[in-house]
From Swiss-Prot:
GO terms for biological process: arginyl-tRNA aminoacylation; glycyl-tRNA aminoacylation. Its main location: cytoplasm. Its EC number is 6.1.1.14. It is an enzyme of class 6 (ligase). The keyword Cytoplasm applies. Tetramer of two alpha and two beta subunits. GO terms for cellular component: cytosol. Keywords: Aminoacyl-tRNA synthetase, ATP-binding, Cytoplasm, Ligase, Nucleotide-binding, Protein biosynthesis. The lineage of its organism: Bacteria, Bacillati, Bacillota, Bacilli, Lactobacillales. It catalyses: tRNA(Gly) + glycine + ATP = glycyl-tRNA(Gly) + AMP + diphosphate. This is Glycine--tRNA ligase beta subunit. It comes from Pediococcus pentosaceus (strain ATCC 25745 / CCUG 21536 / LMG 10740 / 183-1w). GO terms for molecular function: arginine-tRNA ligase activity; ATP binding; glycine-tRNA ligase activity. It is found in: Cytoplasm.
């Protein structure tokens, strides 16, 4: 007979951002529990609101299936004495298995006889096992935990009730002072407690108490209500998915409504209005048919339509107060020019071990010059970058950003435009924060991309120089995100930047300009390179590049981020080639013999010491590749693969490790020069070939 089991954890209000990951975790843990305990079932339904996490397991069997197994015991020489009598070890083993020595058989494993018993394990009843879900409930992890009353137990919020019903039967267990039963709670204000007769009536009974437990159903209802309000007012609304998810996890009985604010506040930059509505008040902003922002909003209350007009007025009042503050700051900020705010950055600490925000601007300006010159940007672009990096953090000390920190960069762009800065400079001030998440949008402008790179490089150089290097999950200054942003920006624009050369150029520029302010870019630079390799690996993993190729390109001698990524794609594409195996084997043969070279200086090769034609033929081709300028990784790999016949011919005719020391050194130097070209692609000995 199939059974249905309901488990509900009743809590005080959970933070909205915790609800969805928590119910997912509960489902995962319950699924693992059922598998571990060999319980068969048809499906698992999940339910979540701000006050409850619940699952219903459908189609459970009566009990675990019986299983048979052979249990291994001690070796025969331990289980029996010299006369063949059973020892205490044998008797104790069989007793522990619920059997007797009469059930013993022997199996030989690697020449040794061992005691075995065959036993039947009867399956436990389902209801007996399900009470073990108590441990599952207690094991859920949350980003923030709390204690309550006098208990040492920690949970996301205090547990106020538990429901545990198998069909119509309560399966009781207790957590702290709460014992599971069939009583659940309705809406905090509109509903009341209700007892469930069985697991199947869960949704209906709570719906009667103004709780929609199905999160997907609740979200769809909210979307429909927003759409209806928008259509009736001829508004355009595109609900932000993140906000919709958050609002959904704030309510149990959603009722959407609309309100408005004075049109005078439309003089404030749109981003400020949207931030006030969306991020601070959880409102959905609206536009007219032409896309213009309107002085209206849509919000969702946790309740019904009763006294909805009071709710509207209350929300309008709160929003108006916030917009009044914004209008004040917007007006006050414009009383000073950009230089005033830049000067104030001298008193703002970037970090107490590194220096002020003003010093950071000077350092970033120097770093940006190196980037701009390396990329051969035109003078207009270089001038824009120079100006942008001298002011790009000024908005941090404005009143608006002090009140609305989410608008840093955005307000910098607005105020820069108002102060007559050109669009490239203004846009770069906003874009230097990009990407602001692992897969966030990248800067659209060249100036913005360079300023973003310089700012992020400075963060990494500064904190690594001060010894504040991320470890494990600890990354308080988001340096991993900054490094990954650098990798993505360089790769997206196909900008070549050798990290070794770049570091040396930055060191020189900082020294010449006197803008290092204690930051030593040489300090922990090996760890900086490893740090970037990890971020390149992250990007290549995201692109589904195989592990062996990732390892190959990261263990070469190339420190150009874009070229490393290109090399990985070149190798991934080349794997399908019919000649790939032969090419890799030829090139790795060169690499392996080159490791025997003890020369560390200039790798001179004297053609006068060649003893056969194959040496000269191969060397001529090596010189041509070395002389080729600006080869892409695709072109370089193609030229290396073209050497396969010459390499094979060379090794057929040449003994590299010649008895004559001069000839041997000459040949090893030639192999090392070719190996160095190969290592620009990567260490091909890591490539798996079939």
């Amino acid at each position: 007979m199939a059974h249905n089991y309901l488990l509900e954890i009743g809590l005080e209000e959970i933070p909205a951002h915790v609800v969805t990951p928590s119910i997912k975790q509960l489902v995962q843990k319950v699924t693992a529990f059922l598998k571990e305990n060999r319980l068969t079932y048809d499906s698992i339904d999940h339910f979540s609101t701000p006050r409850r996490l619940a699952i219903r397991i459908n189609g459970l069997g009566d009990q675990q299936p019986d299983i048979e197994e052979d249990a291994k015991g001690p070796a025969r020489k331990i289980a029996q004495d010299a006369d063949g009598n059973w020892t205490k070890a044998a008797i104790g083993f069989t007793r522990g298995q619920g059997l007797t020595v009469d059930d013993i058989t022997f199996k030989t494993i690697k020449g040794t006889d061992y005691v075995y018993v065959h036993k039947l394990i009867k399956g436990k009843m389902t209801k007996e096992i399900l009470t073990g879900l108590k441990e599952v409930v207690e094991s859920i992890n949350f980003p923030t935990m709390m204690k309550w009353a006098n208990f040492d137990f920690k949970y996301v919020r205090p547990i106020r009730w538990l429901v545990s019903i198998l069909d119509e039967e309560v399966l009781p267990f207790s957590i702290l002072d709460v014992t599971a039963g069939r009583r659940t709670e309705g809406h905090r204000f509109l509903g009341e407690a209700v007892e469930l007769a069985n697991a199947e009536e869960y949704e209906a009974k709570l719906h009667d108490q103004f709780v929609i437990v199905d999160a997907d159903e609740r979200k769809q209802l909210i979307s429909n209500q927003i759409k209806a309000i928008a259509e009736s007012n001829r508004w355009n609304v595109t609900p932000n998915p993140g906000l919709l998810e958050e609002v959904n996890n704030l309510v149990e009985w959603p009722t959407a409504f609309n309100g408005g604010f004075d049109e005078k506040y439309l003089a404030i930059p749109e981003e400020v209005l949207i931030t006030s509505m969306r991020d601070h008040q959880r409102f959905f902003f609206v536009r007219d048919q032409a896309g213009k922002l309107l002085p209206n909003f849509i919000s969702v209350r946790n309740g019904n339509e009763e006294f909805i007009e009071n709710v509207v007025r209350g929300n309008e009042k709160v929003l108006t107060a916030r917009l009044e503050d914004a209008a004040f700051f917007y007006e006050e900020d414009q009383k000073h020019d950009i230089n005033y705010y830049v000067d104030r950055l001298k008193k703002v600490s970037f970090h107490d071990k590194i220096g002020s925000m003003y010093e950071k601007l000077q350092r970033v300006n120097s770093i940006a010059k190196v980037i701009g010159n390396t990329l051969n940007l035109n003078q207009t672009e270089l001038d824009d970058i120079d100006r942008a990096t001298m002011i790009y953090k000024f908005d941090l000390v404005t009143g608006m950003v002090g009140e609305f920190s989410e608008l840093q960069g955005v307000m910098g762009e607005k105020y820069a435009q108002l102060n007559g800065e050109n669009q490239a400079v203004a846009q770069a001030i906003r874009e230097h924060y990009m990407p602001n998440s692992a897969e966030g949008d990248l800067p659209e402008s060249v100036t913005g991309a360079v300023v973003a790179l310089a700012d992020k490089f400075d963060n990494i150089f500064s904190f690594f120089s001060a010894g504040m290097i991320p470890s494990g999950s600890n990354d308080p200054y988001a340096l991993r995100r900054h490094a990954y942003g650098i990798v993505r920006i360089l790769n997206s624009r196909d900008w070549q930047l050798d990290l070794n050369q770049f570091k040396s150029q930055v060191k020189t520029e900082l020294a010449e300009n006197g803008t290092a302010f204690g930051v030593d870019v040489d300090q922990n630079f090996d760890q900086v390179l490893n740090f970037f390799n990890d971020r390149i690996k992250q990007l290549l993993d995201h692109q589904k590049i195989s592990h062996d190729i990732v390892e190959t390109v990261l263990t070469g001698n190339n420190h150009d981020v874009t070229e490393i990524i290109e090399a990985a794609q070149v190798l991934a594409d080349a794997k399908a080639s019919s000649t790939f195996k032969d090419d890799i084997e030829a090139l790795t043969r060169v690499q392996r013999i080159a490791t025997k070279n003890e020369e560390s200086g200039e790798l001179n090769v004297d053609p006068q010491l060649f003893n056969n034609a194959s040496e000269g033929e191969l060397f001529d081709q090596i010189i041509k590749i070395e002389a080729a300028n600006n080869l892409t990784m695709s072109q370089l790999f193609a030229k290396l693969c073209e050497l396969t016949p010459a390499i094979s011919k060379y090794f057929d005719a040449t003994m590299v490790m010649d008895k004559d020391e001069n000839i041997k050194r000459n040949r090893l130097n030639m192999m090392s020069r070719l190996a160095n070209l190969i290592l620009k692609i990567g260490d091909l000995t890591n490539v798996l070939v079939k």
